[in-house]
Every structure is written in structure tokens, then in C-alpha cells.
Amino acid sequence: MSVEIITHLGTVDPVMKRLVAAAGPLAIESRDDHSPYEVLARAIAHQQLNGKAAQSILNRFVSTCGQGIFPTPAALLALEDAALRASGFSFSKIAALRDLAAKTMSGVVPVRDVLHALSDLEIIERLTAVRGIGRWTVQMLLMFQLRRPDVLPVDDFGVRMGFQLAYGLKRLPAPQVLGLYGARWAPYRSAAAWYLWRAVDLSRAGQLPPCLEAVQLPRLPRKRRKAARKPPRRLKRVAVSAAPRAPTGVRTRARRPPARRSRAPKKKK
């Protein structure tokens, strides 16, 4: 399968072909074998925190609230907010965890076997219904837990940075542009994303091959292009005199204001 993927990427994209040769064999490894509920709960814990701080919170959560085992959805819903706060969760994350637990018990977030039977789009639609879970989080689950082969996380900063570096661009590509360009990598866009992540590492090590082609990025339709652009800056208002200026070298007579007519005093009767 890896040979088939590399052959396909090299056939449809010469820049990707050189990147694959520099990065070496594809190595997308499964991160863990947790249930979708636990994967998403851990993702919520990691939001806006570094890995060490998030893992410390999860360790306290498992030890104090689950007696060494990750709490089930029912057990999480039975916990008081004070217990979750003592573990280190913020109020917004507590609300997200409770919503995740409730939707897991109702079947919106299915077990792994049911999840495998759904398409990528169906999984994204169902899991992003959970509070605090966005498209990127679900795409990471698709790539690393479910090993789906055709996922391109266009909003991922590392993927966009890798594309900019590998393709010799002056700026980061817009997510919509990256999505349109990356359509040629299907049905192996997960592998392409992995190689774009590797492009960042190769660039830091000074081993990234230069882009030899003039890459033509797809143009967005007019409505999307306007949305992708930055809002225009507001121009400062400059006071302009209402009186027109005379051309250079032309003498003009200054206009005097009209004289006010004085009324004659009324005669006394």
C-alpha cells in the first residue's frame, strides 16, 4: 500500500514526488486504541494547554474520579462540578465533557465498531455536534485512530506551513486554496498531509528540496475569494476645503461676502 501511495503522489505532483524522496517512507502510526468518547475527552482536556499540563489534569481526573480507570460517560455525568474543578478543568471544559458524555450515551457519539461503518463526512457531522469539538479534532481522530487514508486537514497550521515551504510560496495558502489544490492527491490525502508536516521538519534541518516549478494555485470563486481576503483598512478622513482652488498662474479676485443691508430707523409717531 505504501508503494502505491508514493507512486500516486509522485505521478500527480512533481513537487510532492521530491518531498517524498527527501522525507522517506510513510509512517502514519496509530496513536492509541481508546474509544471515540475517551479520544474526544482527552482532546477537550488538551485544548489551549501544553501537553504536560493537559496530561497532569487527565492523570488527576482518572485517579480521583475514576479510581485509576478513565471514567465512563455515566460516571462522568454523576460527578459534581467541584470534583471536575479539583481535577483542573475549567467551567467551559466541564460543560463540553458533560455534553460529550450525554451524546455518547444517546448514541450521537458511537462506539468504535459503529464509527468504522460511517463515512468521513458522516463522522465529522456527528462528532462536531459535541460542544467544544471542531472539524480539526475529528480529522485527527480519522487519521490517527481510524487510519482513514483520504483526510486533508486544511486548517492545520503545520500542513499549511509545509505546503508554503515545499512549494516555494511567499505566504501561507488559504485553507480553501489548499483544499482545491490537494484534490489531486486523492484518495491518499492523509499521506500528503503527513509529508507536508515532514516538510517543516526538513526545512528546519536544511534538507528540504527546492521547488523547481512555477506552482499555479487554483483561483477561488469570486464570493469565496472575497471571504478569504483580509478586510480593507479604513481610510482616515481628511478635511477638504469646500472652496475650489484656482489653476496655477491664474489670478482671481477674492470674493467678498455680501454687504448686509441696514434697515432705516422707524419714525417715531
Listing of model-derived features with the role each one plays in the protein:
Residues 37, 41, 50, 54, ...:
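Hydrophobic (often cysteine-bearing) scaffold residues that line and stabilize catalytic clefts
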Residues 29, 37, 53, 68, ...:
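Short, surface-exposed helix-loop/turn micro-motifs enriched in polar/charged residues
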Residues 35-39, 75-78, 123, 178:
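Alpha-helical scaffolds flanking conserved acidic
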Residues 30-38, 88-91, 182-189:
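Structural motif
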Residues 1-28, 120-121, 135-269:
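C-terminal accessory module of base-excision DNA glycosylases/AP lyases that mediates lesion recognition
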